[in-house]
């Protein structure tokens, strides 16, 4: 009779009053090896009384033609909440370190003991690809954001220089008009023409860079929150 589920982080226990079934690891070596691989538990060797509960299988994996729920011959477990298990193990590790620090004075031997305890716990935080891929993604996004910041700084400098030139030109033309050096109304024709020659494409690039930076920042926050 099954007592609990062998999946990492799964607390499901056998109860005849709930609609959850338990299934042994297959005897066929190839299928058994595939199940063990999908469970992703380090140094895990299932025994005769090792079970997985039905929560780790898709609905299409079950044969419901009989009175009992059975797995099909090609069924494999694919539903696991690995992220929750990692968080749980990290929390236990932090709590253990805090407890050790509060119960004993700090010293080289105690520090070594704490590190060893943490390593023992983290050894059971099974290796997954997703956290590593997330870390690489975060690093890439941070580099892209830094590049956009440099571009935006350059565009802002160009914008400030263009603005200063525009203000100086406007003041000069207005002053020449006031001293009758230029005829009245010259600024109304000259300044719009001068404005059209300014590098307005730089301002468009600045606007696009700001939008890209915002999108990358949102993407970075979502990626980090997934694995915190």
From Swiss-Prot:
Origin: domain of life: Eukaryota
Keywords for this protein: DNA-binding, Metal-binding, Zinc, Zinc-finger
MF terms (GO), sorted A to Z: DNA binding; zinc ion binding
Chain positions of all zinc fingers (THAP-type): 1-80
PANTHER family (UniProt xref): THAP DOMAIN-CONTAINING PROTEIN 2
Organism: Homo sapiens
Gene Ontology CC: nucleolus; nucleus
Lineage: Eukaryota, Metazoa, Chordata, Craniata, Vertebrata
UniProt name for this protein: THAP domain-containing protein 2
Matches recorded under InterPro entries: THAP2, THAP_Znf, THAP_Znf_sf
Motif (HCFC1-binding motif (HBM)): 123-126
């Amino acid at each position: 009779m099954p007592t609990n589920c062998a999946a990492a982080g799964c607390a499901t226990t056998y109860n005849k009053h709930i609609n959850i079934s338990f299934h042994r690891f297959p005897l066929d070596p190839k299928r058994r090896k595939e199940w063990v691989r999908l469970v992703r538990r380090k140094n895990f060797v299932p025994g005769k009384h090792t079970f997985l509960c039905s929560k780790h299988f898709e609905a299409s994996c079950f044969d419901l033609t009989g009175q009992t729920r059975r797995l099909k011959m090609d069924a494999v477990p694919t539903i696991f909440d690995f992220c929750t298990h990692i968080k749980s193990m990290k929390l236990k590790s932090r709590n253990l370190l805090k407890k050790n620090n509060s119960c004993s004075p700090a010293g080289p031997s105690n520090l070594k003991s704490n590190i060893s305890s943490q390593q023992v716990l983290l050894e059971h935080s099974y290796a997954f690809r997703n956290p590593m891929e997330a870390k690489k993604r975060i690093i890439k996004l941070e580099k892209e954001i830094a590049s956009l910041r440099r571009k935006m700084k350059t565009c802002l400098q160009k914008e400030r220089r263009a603005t200063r030139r525009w203000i100086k030109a406007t003041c000069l033309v207005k002053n020449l008009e006031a001293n009758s050096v230029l005829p009245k109304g010259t600024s109304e024709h000259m300044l719009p023409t001068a404005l059209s020659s300014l590098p307005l494409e730089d301002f468009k690039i600045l606007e696009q860079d700001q939008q890209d930076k915002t999108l990358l920042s949102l993407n970075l926050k979502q990626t980090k929150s997934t694995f915190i």
